[in-house]
């Protein structure tokens, strides 16, 4: 077993481009619920402490919102995925919805601004060009709204099934929490063709372009982000068992504690299987860990990082993050390629010096798991921001230096954590009849887009446990 792990650690099978890796793997009204103090001032010292906490959290939310303000296209409502860079992924669109909803419910923006921002973004989602005429492209230009590749050139580069699942969940949340937008969220989804992105059992398929321009399909998703994406499809009525439920896992002991990881062999698939914090944070805040086994997995991931702090006095909040320099996508892992605390790049190489105390992972664990370690996490990251631009990615473990890159994923996650802390779970398992239901309820009305009412029942065992098919060259 150790030999196999070493091969995984040093072999070339993990070598993916940053963009390919991202594609395959795939983040309360203040006055009423805890961020704005009561009128009339504090009545005793405990109220004074609470008021100070509320003011602090309000400032945190405003700082995160500054990123969105600075990076929004005024015509389409798209928000740059990285500061001052107009590339927008489908996952970024979900982050923009999350950030905007959180800002409104936390009292950071007024109703009119909220309406304008949501209307523009949903208007774009309901009319944007689609990859192969089927589904959202992996990337768009914020300024033009056109499909692009990750170098910023016009191109149809295929879709990410994981990113689409993330967007589906937030479109459903938007319609649930703000019913005036449900019709428009529904209309965006109804126009998509789901025939090749998810099968009848819930296996997710991304698409890409080979060097010669040919389109290809590949099984997409690994433990964590795959389940989060599957929940997005399930929210719209798709049978998503193969992706929403946990795949086959194996366990490794770290400090005598078990940590489960995806059993799919990265050497055979070319796709790494890191254990990361953020997918379990998002599953907790958005879904309440409602799928069997997800709460236990999250507890393992959170607890082992706290244990590292107790034993080694190393504050730890590990997750994936983005850099402006190579390797661009960093898989800062609890466990990966056979080793604990392994930091990998998109090229499969180790980047130990890029190990990070992630701002968004720290905020997420703080919101979900209050306690001494949560307080230490916040103490570590609470000043990692530019008041005019937003929150930084985090603090380097080795030196303590701030990693000053600014991204939508991190700033949206801060807002989402504050909203969760104020109001609890963000997605309710209840469906209000609307446009989507009207279009899919009639068995004689078939749009031929493989919507839930147009599908056969799942008859096979979940295919996610089988060996996935990696895209060529990955």
Please place each PLM-identified region on the residue numbering.
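C-terminal, flexible cofactor-proximal segment of oxidoreductases
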Residues: 1
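Bacterial N-terminal signal peptides that target proteins for export
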Residues: 4-22
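Bacterial N-terminal signal peptides
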Residues: 20-32
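Ser/Thr/Asn(+Pro)-rich, low-complexity disordered segments
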Residues: 34-474
């Amino acid at each position: 077993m150790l030999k196999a792990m070493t091969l995984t650690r040093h072999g070339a099978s993990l070598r993916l481009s940053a963009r390919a890796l991202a594609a395959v793997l795939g983040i309360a009204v203040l006055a009423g619920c805890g961020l704005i103090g009561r009128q009339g001032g504090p009545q005793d010292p405990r109220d004074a402490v609470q008021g100070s906490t509320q003011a602090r959290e309000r400032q945190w939310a405003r700082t995160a919102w500054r990123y969105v303000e600075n990076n929004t296209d005024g015509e389409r409502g798209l928000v740059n995925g990285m500061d001052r860079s107009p590339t927008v992924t489908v996952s970024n669109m979900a982050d923009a919805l999350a950030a905007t909803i959180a800002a409104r419910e936390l009292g950071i923006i007024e109703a009119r601004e909220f309406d304008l921002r949501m209307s523009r973004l949903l208007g774009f989602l309901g009319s944007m060009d689609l990859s192969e005429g089927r589904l959202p492209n992996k990337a768009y230009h914020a300024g033009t709204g056109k499909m692009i590749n990750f170098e910023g050139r016009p191109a149809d580069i295929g879709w990410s099934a994981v990113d689409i699942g993330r967007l589906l969940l937030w479109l459903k949340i938007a319609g649930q929490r703000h019913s005036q937008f449900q019709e428009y969220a529904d209309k965006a989804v109804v126009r998509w063709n789901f025939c090749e992105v998810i099968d009848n059992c819930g296996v997710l398929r991304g698409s890409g372009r080979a060097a010669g321009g040919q389109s290809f399909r590949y099984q997409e998703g690994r433990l964590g982000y795959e389940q989060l994406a599957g929940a997005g499809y399930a929210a719209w009525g798709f049978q998503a068992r193969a992706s929403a439920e946990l795949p086959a896992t194996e366990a490794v002991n770290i400090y005598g504690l078990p940590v489960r990881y995806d059993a799919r062999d990265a050497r055979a698939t070319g796709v790494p299987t890191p254990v990361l914090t953020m997918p379990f944070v998002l599953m907790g805040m958005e879904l309440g860990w409602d799928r069997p086994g997800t709460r236990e997995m999250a507890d393992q991931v959170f607890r082992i990082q706290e244990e590292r702090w107790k034993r080694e006095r190393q504050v730890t909040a590990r997750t994936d993050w983005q850099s402006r320099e190579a390797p661009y996508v960093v898989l800062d892992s609890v466990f990966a390629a056979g080793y604990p605390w392994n930091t990998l790049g998109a090229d499969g190489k180790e980047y130990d010096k890029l190990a990070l105390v992630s701002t968004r992972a720290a905020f997420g664990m703080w919101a979900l798991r209050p306690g001494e370690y949560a307080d230490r996490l916040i103490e570590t990251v609470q000043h990692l921001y530019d008041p005019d631009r937003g929150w930084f990615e985090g603090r380097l473990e080795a030196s303590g230096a701030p990693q000053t890159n600014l991204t939508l994923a991190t700033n949206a996650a801060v807002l989402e954590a504050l909203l969760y802390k104020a109001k609890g779970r963000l997605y309710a398992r209840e469906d209000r009849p609307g446009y989507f239901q009207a279009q899919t309820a009639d068995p004689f009305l078939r749009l031929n887009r493989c919507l839930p009412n147009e599908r056969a029942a799942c008859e096979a065992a979940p295919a996610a446990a089988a060996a996935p098919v990696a895209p060529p060259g990955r």
